[in-house]
Amino acid sequence: MDRSHIEQIAALERECFSTPWSEAMLTEALFDSQASFIVAESEEGGVLGYAGLQVVLDEGYIDNIAVEPNARRHGVADELLDVFCRFGEANLAFLTLEVRASNAPAIALYRKHGFEEAGRRKNYYTKPAEDAVIMTRYFKRIGNEHG
């Protein structure tokens, strides 16, 4: 992700999430040394989807995965998640994320990539209030008893 993507990603955030990241938040994230963002683009250069990852030591937290409604069911989210999982396999003990309990397609995608439910956060989401399912994927690394 670079500055040229910010406006389109902010629009995608507004379309996909009830509490979206603003252009200012996305711009600030560009300069966060612990954050990495990847973008899937169409042949014309439009943003089809994006994903964000925060890394602290050997722990990864997937902040966001969003895909344009017209691009869904075409493997965009699958590819974005695959990039972070390959990074995790090489560099992390685990990846974790939260997902709305009602978001069955996303939960199925995460399970396909080896994530398992690790817990729930009651009323984590607003607009509407809903529980978050915490999902984690552990990687086989020396000293990682979960992998």
Report residues per predicted region.
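Conserved GNAT acetyl-CoA-binding A-motif
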Residues: 88-98
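Residue-level recognition of the GNAT/N-acetyltransferase active site
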Residues: 68, 72, 98-102, 127
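Short glycine/proline-centered loop/turn elements that form peptide/ligand docking sites
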Residues: 77, 81, 102-106, 123-128
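Acetyl-CoA-dependent GNAT
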Residues: 3-70, 78-87, 138-146
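Conserved active-site tyrosine of GNAT-family acetyltransferases
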Residues: 110, 115, 135
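Short aromatic/hydrophobic contact patches that present stacked aromatics
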Residues: 64-66, 96-98, 134-136
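Conserved phosphate-binding and hydrolysis motifs of nucleotide-dependent enzymes
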Residues: 2, 49, 75-77, 103, ...
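Conserved catalytic-core motifs of GNAT/GCN5-like acyltransferases
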Residues: 96-98, 116-132
